[in-house]
Amino acid sequence: MTEVIETKEVENIISEQSLKTESVKVSNKRSRDDEEMKDSEGGVKKTSFPQISVEDTEEEQIRKVTIPFNRIAPLKANWQQIYEPIVTHLKLQIRMNTKTRKVELKTSKSTKETSALQKAADFVHAFSLGFEVNDAVAILRLDDLYIDSFDVEDVKILKGDNLSRAIGRVAGKDGKTKFTIENVTKTRIVLADKRIHILGSYSNIRVAKDAICDLIIGSPPGKVYAKLRTVSSRIAERF
């Protein structure tokens, strides 16, 4: 009996100690909350960190863009047009590594813009996909341009002549259909075999992609043109 009474007393003491510790934690939490409320009511300024510039980073940043075999010759022919905006405006260093087939981009001491390296990489990548230099250089000037790539078979599984006819419907006679979609949606489109690349703003890419998907499925071009004009007019009214 005495042992049972002693164990009960020990349990009571332990429970009392645990309650005390919990009450201390709650009171500490309340005091912290009160201090935070006082700071917010008193108008205490929050700590603000200055914006990091490229000069603050000690290490040089490097980006490499792989160039496909079929774009090496156009790259050599248009190297001056690619080289000038990257070096002159973005203040980056650029070189072509012929062994690895990669364009190497590197920041320098004169680089001021933090997003310069990413913009240059996107510009070179757009050219490697097949876009003209005059179209791809818009990535350096505008911030809201993107590239959306997809396969024809992602829309509809086609093989052989059916696949060729679907690509032909997207291109049109002498590229007329593709040019019409580009002009109406203010985008640029590259047909690289089964792969399709679209350069433009998010909303315009969506309209152009819907039109291309309709053509792949088998919709007549006249119907696609009418739908394009109505959708593009709505976008123009909205913005």
Swiss-Prot record:
A GO cellular component annotation here is: small-subunit processome
Q: Which PANTHER family match?
A: RIBONUCLEASE Y, RNA-BINDING PROTEIN PNO1
Localization, UniProt: Nucleus, Nucleolus
Some GO term, biological process aspect, for this entry: which one? ribosomal small subunit biogenesis
- What protein does this entry describe? RNA-binding protein pno1
Q: How does it assemble?
A: Part of the small subunit (SSU) processome, composed of more than 70 proteins and the RNA chaperone small nucleolar RNA (snoRNA) U3.
What taxonomic classification does the UniProt entry list for its organism?
Eukaryota, Amoebozoa, Evosea, Eumycetozoa, Dictyostelia
Does the keyword field hold RNA-binding?
A: yes
Gene3D superfamilies reported in the protein's UniProt record = K Homology domain, type 1 (3.30.1370.10)
Per UniProt, the ranges with Basic and acidic residues bias are: 30-44
Supply the alphabetized keyword list: Nucleus, RNA-binding
Question: Which residue spans traverse the membrane?
Answer: none
A GO term, aspect molecular function? RNA binding
Please state every residue range assigned to the domain named KH.
160-212
Task: State the superkingdom.
Answer: Eukaryota
Family according to the record: Belongs to the PNO1 family.
User: Which Pfam families does the UniProt record give?
Assistant: KH_PNO1_2nd
Keyword Acetylation on entry: no
Disordered: annotated segments: 21-45
* Annotated function: Part of the small subunit (SSU) processome, first precursor of the small eukaryotic ribosomal subunit. During the assembly of the SSU processome in the nucleolus, many ribosome biogenesis factors, an RNA chaperone and ribosomal proteins associate with the nascent pre-rRNA and work in concert to generate RNA folding, modifications, rearrangements and cleavage as well as targeted degradation of pre-ribosomal RNA by the RNA exosome. Positively regulates dimethylation of two adjacent adenosines in the loop of a conserved hairpin near the 3'-end of 18S rRNA.
